[in-house]
A protein has these predicted regions:
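An active-site-proximal beta-strand-loop segment
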Residues: 139, 143-182
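Short, structured coil segments at secondary-structure junctions
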Residues: 230-231
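C-terminal domain-tail junction helix/linker
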Residues: 262-311
Length: 311
């Protein structure tokens, strides 16, 4: 109709649509070089849209069942999708899963309660933090080998403590930078001697695989030389109030808080519960690991090293 002398208003009336539809159709399907409406281009685009519409994601009951199961295991929608790809299991996008979760909430469901709380503001540790003081013979992170930053080898660890309600009780957290593997132990307090002993005991099975440990400047790590000697490793410290230099450990502590929230009385947390949390985190797929679990990544690195050295 554009080839005959008809106005866009007349065309709209002739085919029974609003005039705005005609303008939109012409704008959407004009040839980029000539600037003229191209009916062949319009048809190709329409056919493509029809095919894409047919490809619209289908969220099957089997998928929903899997999502519910993995949400209960504390996986995020993104982790669920990534892990499904690793296992070659069909799954919708994480955006679709989120929409389904919020729809469930509007209908009175509780799936949203399995999501981690998002949007927490980042804050550096400041002078309000107690327990900072002089640590003899500390070696700063600047002297740590550059290979540690590459996160390619197992055995470069970060260590920290989480404090309980009213500063009573503590939890020791150790994690590997390359695999995100974590060791969690309950402490009666933050005295340096028991912290050193528990650290050595927790890592005894991987002693021969450890290269470095990096800590913050808490006085609980004042016996770092004992740890370094007994594990035969090098021990380093972040710059004061530079907790982001232990980014992996800070992230791990956030994951642990999912199970042990701030203000929790640690006397109510059993060693059995601590072990359950450790196992859960070590078997949770991680995005940065290509949705492998820390335990799977650990085995992968160890196997690669075995092949490389012919053992």
């Amino acid at each position: 109709m554009l080839q005959v002398p008809m106005s866009k208003k007349d065309i709209a009336e002739a085919i029974g649509v609003d005039r705005s539809n005609i303008y939109r159709e012409i704008k959407r399907n004009c040839d980029s070089r000539s600037g003229k409406y191209n009916p062949d281009l319009a048809q190709r685009k329409a056919d493509k849209r029809k095919v894409e519409k047919k490809r619209k994601e289908v969220f099957t009951q089997a998928m929903k069942k899997r999502v519910k199961k993995l949400l209960r295991k504390d996986l995020s929608p993104e982790q669920i999708v990534g892990r499904s790809q690793v296992e070659n299991i069909a799954m919708v996008s994480h955006e679709t899963i989120y929409c389904w979760i919020w729809q469930d909430k509007r209908q009175g469901g509780d799936l949203h309660k399995s999501l981690r709380r998002q949007g927490r503001k980042y804050s550096k540790r400041g002078s309000k933090n107690a327990g900072r003081g002089f640590i003899p013979n500390r070696v700063e992170i600047d002297q740590r080998p550059s290979i540690v930053e590459q996160k390619e080898r197992f055995g470069d660890l970060e260590i920290d403590t989480i404090i309980g309600k009213n500063h009573k009780g503590a939890i020791l957290t150790i994690n590997d930078r390359a695999t995100s593997r974590v060791w969690i132990r309950k402490l009666s307090g933050k005295e340096a001697i028991p912290v050193a002993k528990i650290t050595v005991w927790a890592l005894r099975k991987v002693k021969n695989l450890i290269h470095t440990i990096t800590a913050d400047n808490g006085k609980e790590f004042a016996k770092h030389e004992d740890i370094a000697q007994k594990l035969d490793i090098n021990f380093y410290f972040c710059k004061p109030y530079h907790s982001w230099e232990r980014g992996a450990n800070e992230n791990t502590n956030g994951l642990i808080r999912q199970y042990i929230p701030k203000g929790k009385d640690f006397s109510e947390v059993t060693n059995k519960r601590i072990k359950w949390i450790e196992n859960n985190l070590n078997n949770r797929p991680r995005k940065r690991l290509g949705y492998l679990t820390p335990n799977e990544k650990f085995k992968q690195i160890i196997n690669m090293n075995s092949v490389a050295f012919g053992t």
